[in-house]
Amino acid sequence: MYCLFCQHTYTRVIDSRVSEDGATIRRRRECEACGERFSTLETIELKLPVIIKKDGGREAFDGRKLRTSFDRALQKRPVAEECIEMALRAVIHRLRMAGEREVPSIVVGEYVMAELRKLDHVGYVRFASVYRSFQDVADFREEIEKLESELLVSREQLPLLEAAMESMGHPSVDQGGKHGV
């Protein structure tokens, strides 16, 4: 790092401290040329990737567009604001953790659909109908049948899960209405 006083190209770190929230490191530095001391603050830079659109164009990630997608899909649906915020954060987290500089918009769309599927099936189908360009009622029917099939599998697995929990000494859902985990 350059010295702020003499512009010498090398300074050494003489002390480092992490902030209380753990997001910043304060470093005390000393210039090897002039001996002046100064402090720097380092923070993590978590850039979101550039989005590659279907037409090949590129644009910076826009959280407002992501929010609009969720809002449109969930319009007039009984989904708590906190749940929507958590879903938004989950999509953004997945984008950051991908570690890519560029991500195709199709990937973002799949992340959104995964979150909507957990939040609200009507919102999921709304989003999927636009995102996947449904052409007719058959496309809607096919998507709804997939959802129903997934729900059926989940319902069939619940008794198996409860039996496994009971065999490990955990009470079932029927005992007190809550999992005893």
From Swiss-Prot:
GO biological process terms, semicolon-separated: negative regulation of DNA-templated transcription
GO molecular function, one term: ATP binding
InterPro entries, per the entry: ATP-cone_dom (IPR005144), NrdR-like_N (IPR055173), RNR_NrdR-like (IPR003796)
Domain of life, per lineage: Bacteria
Record note on cofactor: Binds 1 zinc ion.
The keyword Isomerase is annotated on this UniProt entry: no
Domain ATP-cone: 49-139
Cofactor: Zn(2+)
Keyword tags: ATP-binding, DNA-binding, Metal-binding, Nucleotide-binding, Repressor, Transcription, Transcription regulation, Zinc, Zinc-finger
Keyword Glycoprotein: no
Pfam families (UniProt xref): ATP-cone, Zn_ribbon_NrdR
Zn finger (unnamed) location: 3-34
NCBIfam families assigned to the protein according to its UniProt record, in alphabetical order: transcriptional regulator NrdR
Task of the protein: Negatively regulates transcription of bacterial ribonucleotide reductase nrd genes and operons by binding to NrdR-boxes.
Protein family per UniProt: Belongs to the NrdR family.
Protein name: Transcriptional repressor NrdR
Gene name linked to the record: nrdR
